[in-house]
């Protein structure tokens, strides 16, 4: 398949050649930063966290930054397929107002409004994220 490249060390490559990539082999799922580019992974996220990883029982570490962190946190929610669809829809439908005469909203305004969006999305469900029976969320950030 030309649309997918798999990078693996020698031992991992041999394992995949012999057994294929199985859900029980996954121990870490990374979620990169990248703003709206992360949304193109929505169908893959829904498959991986909706059906595929459900076929295994091991602990999985989810590591993410920026949109990758929100994607990985969403994987920890009850009904992840529905949650991923809502995350995508909410992200796409964001709208930022700004004052007359400004060419764009201020960074503070964007931060405040995005913070409210996160509260609206995850509010009341933080324990689902933090107490998932199998997934351990790790958020990478820098200032």
Predicted regions and their residues:
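Catalytic nucleophile loop
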Residues: 59-74
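Short, surface-exposed basic-aromatic patches at helix termini and helix-loop junctions that form
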Residues: 53, 75-78
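Helix-rich "cap/lid" substructures immediately adjacent to catalytic or cofactor-binding pockets
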Residues: 1-60
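Short loop/turn hinge sites at secondary-structure boundaries
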Residues: 19-23, 77-78, 90
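N-terminal, well-ordered alpha-helical segments
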Residues: 42, 46, 69-73, 116
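Generic alpha-helical scaffold signal
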Residues: 34-42, 65-66, 81, 108, ...
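Extended hydrophobic secondary-structure segments that form protein cores and membrane-embedded regions
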Residues: 29-30, 61-65, 137-140
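Patatin-like phospholipase catalytic region
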Residues: 79-143
């Amino acid at each position: 398949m030309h649309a997918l490249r798999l990078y693996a060390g020698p031992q991992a490559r041999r394992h995949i050649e012999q057994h294929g990539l199985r859900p029980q082999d996954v121990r870490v799922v990374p979620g990169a930063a990248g703003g709206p580019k992360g949304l193109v992974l929505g169908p893959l996220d829904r498959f991986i966290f909706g059906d595929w990883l459900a076929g295994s029982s091991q602990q999985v570490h989810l590591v993410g930054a920026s949109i990758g962190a929100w994607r990985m946190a969403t994987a920890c929610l009850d009904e992840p397929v529905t949650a991923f669809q809502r995350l995508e829809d909410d992200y796409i439908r964001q709208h930022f107002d700004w004052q007359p005469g400004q060419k764009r909203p201020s960074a503070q305004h964007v931060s405040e409004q995005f913070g409210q969006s996160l509260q609206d999305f995850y509010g009341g469900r933080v324990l689902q994220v933090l107490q998932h029976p199998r997934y351990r969320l790790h958020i990478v950030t820098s200032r």
